[in-house]
Amino acid sequence: MAKETFDRSKPHVNIGTIGHVDHGKTTLTAAITTVLANKGLAAKRDFSSIDNAPEEKERGITINTAHVEYSTANRHYAHVDCPGHADYVKNMVTGAAQMDGAILVVAATDGPMPQTREHILLARQVGVPQLVVFMNKVDMVDDPELLELVEMEIRELLSFYDFDGDNIPVVQGSALGGLNGDAKWVGTIEQLMDSVDNWIPIPPRLTDQPFLMPVEDVFSITGRGTVATGRIERGVINSGEPVEILGMGAENLKSTVTGVEMFRKILDRGEAGDNVGLLLRGIEKEAIRRGMVICKPGSVTPHKKFKAEVYVLSKEEGGRHTPFFNNYRPQFYFRTTDVTGIISLAEGVEMVMPGDNVTISVELINAVAMEKGLRFAIREGGRTVGAGQVTEILD
């Protein structure tokens, strides 16, 4: 099949299907592509091609994920679906599949189940901004009062985890009916995609966010000054703009960018995704090192203490073979560098086993420029033993 060119004329949104095992997430994913393919907006994907998701390695963690893409009249979507519950946990916690929103699938025959709850909690913890609900298998329930009850339960659960349970769209339908082209149920799939279009926000573009670049390397050019290299994480930098240098012991370092170097040419600007060298006025080479960040003044602050949601690699994934306990001191790899930190477990948690996902508090020995949502790996002797993201800043 010819690869379609990425259509940039429509806004791009990353979404995924979440919910309890066997509630119909993969069937729904197949149904969405089938219904949209009939309108010429997607390539049809059958159940088995999505269900046999290839293994991917993200920071050494093995995750099975199916990536599907499709468009509606208004947007272009990249959609992730995971075959197993553990894959969801890893995907969401490590941020391997960044979601701007998600479709929560709940079978009307069962109502909310343990993984329904866990996925909603994870979505809240890792900052998925909005959810839309697809109540599946409605064709197998005869009692309209039961459907009402299940919907009420779902809404209460969403509100409990601080989502807008009163107003979130809940679409009742049948994924299998939609997949089989049954007109009544195809309509519910179309209704679902309208809800996704209208309810899930378009993410702010990286170039619209405040400038930030993690420093990878530093050198000096005779007669020109100090150059810091790295990949711009977000925002735009123009020659002549002021910047601040933070983290890893940087004390009140401010400078002005006098040039942006890319492919050995001096440019006037760099933007998110570019690998650049920034010429910095009045800064000694010794003052900057890998692991610091260069950013728009006042946009980020360095911190040492934070809470995080973490996935701990299993032994099979090359992680630890034994549990860790309170006051465990591994390295935390943020952006471009390792910083030692001390882990405190929540009250009542004695230890953490390989393969667990857990909420921890951390105190680093050096402050790092961070904010909610920042991802990191946990390493021990150079190998990755966990991954996670910051859920709350504590200092």
From Swiss-Prot:
PROSITE patterns: G_TR_1, G_TR_2
Superkingdom classification of source: Bacteria
Annotated TM spans: none
Region of interest called G3, as start-end residue ranges on this chain: 81-84
Matching Gene3D superfamilies: P-loop containing nucleotide triphosphate hydrolases (3.40.50.300), Translation factors (2.40.30.10)
Ranges for region G4: 136-139
EC top class, as a word: hydrolase
Domain tr-type G: start-end pairs: 10-205
Catalytic reaction equation(s): GTP + H2O = GDP + phosphate + H(+)
InterPro entries listed in its UniProt record: EF-Tu_GTP-bd (IPR041709), EF-Tu_GTPase (IPR050055), EFTu-like_2 (IPR004161), EFTU_2 (IPR033720), G_TR_CS (IPR031157), P-loop_NTPase (IPR027417), Small_GTP-bd (IPR005225), T_Tr_GTP-bd_dom (IPR000795)
Binding-site residues for Mg(2+), renumbered to this chain: T26
Main location: cytoplasm
Compartments in which it is found: Cytoplasm
Residues noted as binding GTP in the record, renumbered to the chain: 19-26, 81-85, 136-139
GO molecular function: GTP binding; GTPase activity; translation elongation factor activity
CDD domains xref list: EF_Tu, EFTU_II, EFTU_III
Subunit-level organization: Monomer.
Name recorded for this polypeptide: Elongation factor Tu
